[in-house]
Amino acid sequence: MSWLDQITWTDDGLVPVIAQEWQSNDVLMFAWMNREALALTAQRGEAVYWSRSRGRLWHKGEESGHVQRVHEIRIDCDADVVLLKVEQLGHQPGIACHTGRHSCFFQLLKDGAWQSVEPVLKDPSSIYK
């Protein structure tokens, strides 16, 4: 049995993936992978995801230059979630979110309202052309 066969895939053939910064342990983003994306990620050492909105493979950083170098690939106890320990690279290292922030998890629930608690490191309009 292949290591890919040991993953518990959804009915759509996907697995949820959390990208975590390998040095700080900050959670950077959540995404999905299909079998091909996970195999390519392991082969290339860079994160490749499945974009559900585009219906295609998405090499992280293909447009922005903010590539994720993969240091470790882990699965949880049920083999139904993948954890990537990554180094977030790019023209301005540390940007993982398409909003120009370090993490996609920049909104904090406080007093019944969502508040942005991380700064924009680079204007997204200058990242995506």
From Swiss-Prot:
Homodimer. Its EC number is 3.5.4.19. GO terms for molecular function: magnesium ion binding; phosphoribosyl-AMP cyclohydrolase activity; zinc ion binding. One of its GO terms (cellular component) is cytoplasm. This is Phosphoribosyl-AMP cyclohydrolase. Binds 1 Mg(2+) ion per subunit. Pathway: Amino-acid biosynthesis; L-histidine biosynthesis; L-histidine from 5-phospho-alpha-D-ribose 1-diphosphate: step 3/9. It is found in: Cytoplasm. Zn(2+) binds at C77, C97, C104. One of its GO terms (biological process) is L-histidine biosynthetic process. Catalyzes the hydrolysis of the adenine ring of phosphoribosyl-AMP. Its main location: cytoplasm. It comes from Leptothrix cholodnii (strain ATCC 51168 / LMG 8142 / SP-6) (Leptothrix discophora (strain SP-6)). It catalyses: 1-(5-phospho-beta-D-ribosyl)-5'-AMP + H2O = 1-(5-phospho-beta-D-ribosyl)-5-[(5-phospho-beta-D-ribosylamino)methylideneamino]imidazole-4-carboxamide. Mg(2+) binds at D76, D78, D80. Its cofactor is Mg(2+); Zn(2+). Keywords: Amino-acid biosynthesis, Cytoplasm, Histidine biosynthesis, Hydrolase, Magnesium, Metal-binding, Zinc.
